[in-house]
Amino acid sequence: METQRASLCLGRWSLWLLLLGLVVPSASAQALSYREAVLRAVDRLNEQSSEANLYRLLELDQPPKADEDPGTPKPVSFTVKETVCPRPTRQPPELCDFKENGRVKQCVGTVTLDQIKDPLDITCNEVQGVRGGRLCYCRPRFCVCVGRG
């Protein structure tokens, strides 16, 4: 009788643990990779853009050192380029070819790797091109050029 009761109790605990595991999603299932978080930022850029064509990730700078907390904002820096796909098509940008002489934008800000929290703070500025061997980023009133020269 005592062993039946212990067995029944153990069975109930196993059932509770199983149900708890199904209800509480694991942290790793909710965490994005650094690249996935940046691609999500590019999607947001395309959603909020008023420009005619979609942008696609062109270059991704090195990720920051590993941080265990996916909810902590991570600094990010990446470059996007205009594609041939019109924005209204809603086609995934990864399937679009880059537009010849399309606009290029340098983007900086922060992203989180947590799928539940969604704070993105990204600013993108158009890259005006190369001047005297230097890459220049321009805003309405001034340009900043980096590199040789």
Curated annotation (Swiss-Prot):
The keyword NAD is annotated on this UniProt entry: no
GO BP term, pick one: defense response to Gram-positive bacterium
GO cellular component: a single term: extracellular space
GO molecular function, one term: lipopolysaccharide binding
Record keyword Protease present: no
Cellular compartment(s): Secreted
Removed propeptide positions: 30-130
Residue ranges, annotated region (Disordered): 61-80
Keywords: Amidation, Antibiotic, Antimicrobial, Disulfide bond, Secreted, Signal
Family: Belongs to the cathelicidin family.
Name of the protein described by the UniProt record: Protegrin-5
Species the sequence originates in: Sus scrofa
